[in-house]
């Protein structure tokens, strides 16, 4: 009899786990468009607990605490027009940097004087990368590609678009390639690294990932940066730019102390994980983080969704073995015991995900691991009712009938 009950327990644990996953599927599809299902469905979108690891890297307002490579320097062009940018590039180029990456979009011709100055400055650069963009900024494939104005000459280009999901507007990923005018185009940061260290750039391609999760090392306080005025005045250490990657972009106006939101983004480095009011990082600094990640091969390995759901299924199955036994034989205390186990399991799983991310740069999706465990405690009541009905209707045997009557 005991062996028979064990077989029934195993069968019901498996079937109840499948039942939980069928309910999750219904919740996510929400065929009746119920608001409660919308809430549950939205919670299935990965809760970015890994943001905890990045949050706070935006802090610090004193000395630069360099975490981003010393080979990367960011220069603020501020409010300069094309002629002023040309003069700034000339000054930078005199210092013999290895690569100059210009994170500005020069769309269409301007006045002839400014364009001729900028074109001349570009031509003097040994290794130059210019930013381009796709018109829509959500990371989807599209063909509306904006290149540098032809009046400025032909130079190496890479798209500077950042992936900005509509839900929380947080930049976590970048696309490793895209199609523009039927041509394969690589991102701006990749082209910069390719000029500086081709072998490191090639390693990114060999990963064969359409998207890469950005491993943020820090904001302005974690990278060497200068204002354009300081560069023009020579107020920087001698030979400091020589042989380095110099990224020229925008991270503050000389005329307005308030942040300019056009190229200002939310990132996981924001001090507030939830309830954020203001963006925290300028686009050129995000590009510096991407360049740093490619150079150092400090990639984050993201597990495939099927793997996360499979692990989640096994975890839910193991919990159901415990929950069903308590439900049938210790029903009076079932909910109390189950909620304690549920809480401890959720804590351990979140901690494990954060630990793997911090120590091994492995990112698991948290929702597929935790959501089934959170739902199964209450869904067992529905599963029990269903099995009792099937027993009366079809004579189906079940482990739920092996304990004392508790209803």
Language model: regions and residue ranges:
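General structural signal for secondary-structure boundaries
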Residues: 48-53, 224-230, 282, 304, ...
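Non-transmembrane functional regions of envelope-associated proteins
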Residues: 2-207, 241-334, 342-346, 374-383
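A Trp-anchored, charged/polar loop motif used as the substrate-binding/catalytic surface
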Residues: 221-239
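Alpha-helical transmembrane segments forming the membrane-embedded cores
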Residues: 308, 329-407
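Active-site Gly/Thr loop motif
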Residues: 210-225, 285
């Amino acid at each position: 009899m005991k062996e028979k009950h064990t077989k029934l327990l195993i069968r019901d644990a498996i079937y109840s786990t499948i039942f939980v996953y069928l309910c999750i599927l219904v919740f996510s599809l929400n065929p009746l468009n119920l608001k409660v299902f919308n809430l549950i469905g939205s919670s299935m979108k990965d809760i970015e607990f890994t943001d905890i690891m990045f949050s706070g890297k935006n802090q610090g307002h004193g000395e630069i605490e360099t975490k981003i490579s010393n080979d990367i320097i960011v220069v603020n062009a501020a409010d300069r027009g094309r002629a002023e940018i040309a003069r700034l590039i000339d000054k930078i180029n005199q210092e013999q940097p290895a690569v100059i990456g210009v994170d500005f979009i020069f769309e269409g011709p301007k006045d002839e004087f400014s364009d001729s100055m900028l074109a001349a400055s570009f031509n003097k650069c040994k290794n130059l990368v210019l930013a381009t963009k796709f018109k829509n900024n959500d990371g989807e494939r599209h063909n509306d590609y904006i290149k540098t104005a032809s009046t400025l000459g032909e130079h190496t280009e890479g798209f500077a678009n950042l992936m900005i999901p509509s839900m929380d507007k947080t930049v976590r990923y970048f696309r490793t390639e895209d199609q523009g005018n039927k041509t394969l185009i690589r991102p701006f940061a990749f082209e910069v690294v390719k000029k500086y260290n081709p072998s490191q750039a090639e390693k990114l391609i060999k990963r064969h990932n359409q998207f890469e999760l950005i491993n943020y090392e820090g904001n302005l306080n974690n990278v060497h940066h200068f204002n354009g005025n300081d560069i023009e005045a020579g107020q920087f250490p001698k030979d400091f730019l020589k042989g380095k990657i110099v990224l020229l972009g925008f991270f503050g106006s000389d005329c307005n102390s308030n942040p300019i939101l056009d190229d200002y983004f939310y990132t996981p480095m924001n001090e507030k994980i939830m309830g954020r009011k203001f963006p925290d990082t300028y686009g050129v600094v995000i590009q510096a983080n991407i360049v740093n990640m490619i150079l150092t091969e400090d990639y984050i390995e993201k597990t495939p969704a099927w793997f996360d759901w499979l692990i989640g299924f096994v975890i839910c199955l193991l919990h159901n073995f415990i929950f069903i036994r308590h439900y049938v034989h210790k029903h009076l205390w079932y909910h109390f015991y189950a909620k304690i186990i549920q809480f401890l399991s959720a804590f351990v799983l979140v901690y494990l995900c954060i630990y793997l991310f911090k120590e091994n740069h492995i990112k698991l999706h948290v929702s597929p691991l935790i959501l089934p465990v959170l739902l199964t405690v209450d869904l067992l009541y529905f599963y029990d009712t269903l099995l009792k009905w099937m027993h009366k209707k079809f004579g189906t045997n079940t482990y739920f009938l092996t304990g004392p009557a508790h209803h």
